[in-house]
Design a protein with these regions (language model features):
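Conserved small-residue-rich beta-alpha loop and adjacent elements
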Residues: 1-32, 80, 102
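Phosphate- and divalent-cation-binding pockets in alpha/beta enzyme and binding domains
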Residues: 16-20, 46, 71, 135-136
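Short, small-residue-enriched loops and turns at beta-alpha junctions
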Residues: 14-15, 41-42, 193
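ALDH superfamily catalytic-core signature
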Residues: 24, 28-29, 59, 65-212
């Protein structure tokens, strides 16, 4: 309801965003209405336990992984909180035989490479009709290869870095795993030389249904 005080526990990877919003709200809201509690990765669970166990907190909203969502669901049971959970998925983009491939590729690029593929609404996989898969892959790879890696404020940059080096390593390992199961890298697939947690825009086809990629 409007006017209820809020406690925000931002992601340990991006705490400054929530703190910036709190600074903008400073002086506009009464003291104690908007409260930001950053926490390191090591302290995220203890902070979560306090929020879940408190009888003063009546509702909890969370966006993140399914594993953490299940933990919060169970932890909030003792205080019977209202819960709003937006959890991980594996949503496909489906390309039918009758699809306009130029439109399909444009949609695929907008979905998959938005914020470096790090948003919760990105398509996680592409299911393409066998009659058009070759043309679709060719067009998609051409668009992906044209993306320029670099600083987000530099002119011409099409895609920036991943959140950290661990994410880059994870991408490398997932691509290697897919190759070992018979997949083919059409473009990208590597960390480029130089500093930063960059990873080449990558298109992989014929990925096994049980692949971690």
């Amino acid at each position: 309801a409007a006017g209820c005080p809020v406690v925000v526990k931002p992601s340990e990877y991006t705490p400054l965003t929530a703190l910036a919003l709190a600074r903008l709200a400073d002086g506009l809201l009464p003291p104690g209405v908007l409260n930001v509690v950053p926490a390191s990765r090591q302290n995220a669970q203890p902070v979560g336990e306090v929020l879940c166990d408190s009888s003063h907190i009546k509702a909890l909203s969370f966006t993140g992984s399914t594993a953490v969502g299940k933990w919060l669901y169970a932890r909030c049971a003792s205080t019977v909180k209202k819960l709003g959970l937006e959890l991980g998925g594996n949503a496909p983009m489906v390309v039918l035989k009758s699809a306009d491939l130029d439109i399909a590729v444009k949609a695929a690029m907008a979905s998959k490479f938005r914020y470096g593929g790090q948003t919760c609404v990105c398509a996680d996989r592409f299911l393409v009709h066998e009659a058009v898969v070759d043309n679709f892959v060719e067009k998609l790879a051409a668009e992906a290869s044209a993306l320029k890696l670099g600083h987000g404020l530099d002119a011409g940059t099409g895609i920036g870095p991943l959140i950290d080096e661990a994410a880059t390593f994870k991408c490398q390992e997932r691509v290697k795993g897919a190759i070992s199961q018979g997949a083919t890298v059409v473009c990208g697939g590597n960390k480029p030389p130089g500093p930063g947690s960059f990873f080449e825009p990558t298109v992989v086809r014929d990925v096994a249904i049980d692949s971690e990629l």
